[in-house]
Amino acid sequence: MNIDEASKIILKPYITEKTFAMVENEQKICFIVANDAPKPKIALAVKTLYNENVLDVNTARTIYGKKAFVKFESTDKSRDLATKIGML
């Protein structure tokens, strides 16, 4: 997957108090993703854009669009990525 395709899947990070706490407690970061994106493509897009290994992806459809909760290997990796994308 190239960066253009990955950018069409991962639209933006979703930042709230709850998702901020998820970075610290559950090693998860929440993204707004394309409505037709399946979980394996979301994981591959995160790997392509941010060079981080993904353990798990959970999705939910909301009024804001489709949210993907992406779990990383350790708290350090999730914190580093959150800092890189401007969440922290």
Regions found by a protein language model. Give the residues of each.
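Contiguous, often N-terminal, cationic amphipathic patches that form binding interfaces
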Residues: 1-88
